[in-house]
């Protein structure tokens, strides 16, 4: 947080400087754009410094400048990208404050802007990634509202699109990490709705997509174990079988992660998600 607070002053000075230049030279477009970009950066550091009200104000000021430019002469693709980021970040501020409905509106606006960049014959990979991030945040907001079915539908769609993006651009860590984030949100939703039996296919898709990243099978194992933990006292034979299946897959995932060089900072047995695995000999053989 201290690092973000230290970054606030340069962004503040930049915003003030370009605002003055914009007032003195209203026809110079680059001053308007730079003032708006500085405000967006200021909002980012304010949010990460624990100042959501100030961040919202900065984002709204940046949005107002970009949208005025858009009405007057249109925006370059680069400026559309920054405007979409402003709306996406504004949505995050609203969700942080549990103003979920307002967050949905902001995320939808970000999606609409991103689609201006992706609805072309050959969209830039970064534009596709930006769209998927906004769509993921939009779906996550529905989870906050406990509209699990709607959230799951949206998450599955964007997970598939993100899988395609990762396949098209192997080795991009940001693209890969977002696929992992989407998987985690899908797992959260399936646990919340007692649909743990639907998780393994998504786990398979992710591990096949990123076979060389040791953190992927480790994270997959975590969510499988967490899901198995929800079946702590299975009442039926089917539930007992599902619990065992999920636990065994979690153990296999940990084994794969360790073989790829993953080294957990803390003993796995201390993690709440792995308590359910304590009863399995294979788990103890793996970590002892």
Model region roles, listed by residue range:
Residues 1-288:
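Alpha-helical protein-protein interaction modules
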């Amino acid at each position: 947080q201290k690092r973000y607070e230290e970054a606030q002053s340069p962004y503040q000075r930049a915003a003030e400087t370009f605002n003055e230049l914009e007032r003195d030279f209203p026809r110079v477009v680059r001053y308007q754009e730079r003032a708006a970009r500085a405000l967006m950066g200021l909002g980012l550091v304010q949010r990460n410094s624990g100042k959501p009200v100030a961040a919202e104000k900065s984002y709204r000021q940046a949005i107002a400048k970009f949208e005025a430019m858009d009405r007057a002469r249109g925006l370059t693709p680069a400026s559309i990208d920054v405007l979409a980021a402003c709306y996406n970040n504004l949505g995050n501020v609203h969700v942080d404050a549990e103003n979920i409905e307002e967050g949905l509106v902001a995320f939808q606006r970000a999606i609409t802007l991103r689609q201006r960049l992706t609805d072309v014959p050959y969209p830039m990979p970064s534009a596709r990634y930006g769209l998927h991030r906004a769509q993921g945040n939009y779906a996550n907001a529905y989870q906050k509202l406990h509209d699990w079915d709607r959230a799951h539908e949206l998450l599955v769609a964007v997970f598939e699109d993100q899988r395609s993006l990762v396949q098209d651009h192997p080795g991009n860590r940001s693209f890969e990490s977002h696929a992992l984030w989407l998987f985690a949100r899908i797992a959260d939703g399936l646990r919340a709705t007692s649909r743990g039996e639907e998780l393994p296919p998504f786990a398979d898709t992710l591990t096949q997509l990123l076979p060389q990243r040791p953190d992927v099978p480790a994270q997959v194992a975590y969510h499988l174990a967490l899901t198995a933990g929800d079946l702590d006292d299975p009442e039926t034979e089917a539930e007992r079988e599902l619990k065992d299946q999920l636990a065994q897959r979690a153990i296999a995932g940990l084994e794969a992660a360790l073989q790829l060089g993953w080294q957990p900072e803390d003993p796995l047995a201390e993690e709440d998600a792995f308590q359910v695995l304590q009863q399995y000999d294979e788990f103890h053989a793996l970590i002892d």
